[in-house]
Each structure stands twice: as C-alpha cells, then as structure tokens.
Amino acid sequence: MANNRAVRVGEQMKKELSDILIRDIKDPRVRFVTVTGVDVTGDLQQATAFITVLGDEEERKATLAGLEKAKGFIRTELGKRIRLRKTPELSFSFDESIQYGNRIESLLRDLNKNDSNE
C-alpha cells in the first residue's frame, strides 16, 4: 500500500506543478502540457511527474527538453509553495495511458461498426 503522506504530497505537487507550468514557465516549447499525475517515493526524495502534450512527436520531445531545462526553477518554485524539509528531485515522463485508452476506444468503435454492418 502506498504511503498516505506520499500520496498527499503527490497530489499537492500535481496542483502546484500545473499552476507553475501555466503561469510561470515562459519557455515557448512548454505549451499545451497537462500534468496527469505525480508519483512520490515513500521517503519523499524523488517524484515522477506524468504529463501529456497536445501535438505530434516532435512537439513532445521539444516539450520534454524545455521541462528538463526548467527543472531547477520548477523545483525551487515547488519548494517555496510546499512546506517540506527537502523538495523531491523531479523527473518527467509521458503518460501513455490516454493514448492507449483512445486506441482501445477506436478499436471497439470499429468492432461495433463491423457488427452493425453484418
């Protein structure tokens, strides 16, 4: 079972990270980013932020590069907003679950079309 404190810190980090990306990041590569979740380790030392990006593969790579470049600033801002002894080390990862869900939905839709045509 996940540590309750880690879950609460992850949820708070998700809210603050979304706000930071919308209001404070000025990098033009970091646009149309949605934070879908944040996993924090039990010792609160590391956090993985799962993001989705609206756009093609090239825009996704550029966004990830922009986030990696701004990682220090983002961590500093999180430290100011969330009262923790040590701000977790951030890493960013693409959330593939939305694309996976869309693919399954389109396959099911195609199956339903084929069944209704027969």
Curated annotation (Swiss-Prot):
GO biological process terms on file: maturation of SSU-rRNA
UniProt KW Cytoplasm keyword: yes
Compartment(s) where it occurs, according to its Swiss-Prot or TrEMBL record: Cytoplasm
Presence of the UniProt keyword Cytoplasm in the record: yes
GO CC terms: cytosol
Superkingdom per UniProt: Bacteria
InterPro entries according to UniProt: KH_dom-like_a/b, RbfA, RbfA_dom_sf, Ribosome-bd_factorA_CS
Keyword annotations: Cytoplasm, Ribosome biogenesis
One MF term in the entry's GO annotations: ribosomal small subunit binding
Primary localization class, coarse: cytoplasm
Gene3D superfamilies the record matches: 3.30.300.20
Oligomeric form and interacting partners: Monomer. Binds 30S ribosomal subunits, but not 50S ribosomal subunits or 70S ribosomes.
Protein purpose: One of several proteins that assist in the late maturation steps of the functional core of the 30S ribosomal subunit. Associates with free 30S ribosomal subunits (but not with 30S subunits that are part of 70S ribosomes or polysomes). Required for efficient processing of 16S rRNA. May interact with the 5'-terminal helix region of 16S rRNA.
Family named by the database record: Belongs to the RbfA family.
Protein name: Ribosome-binding factor A
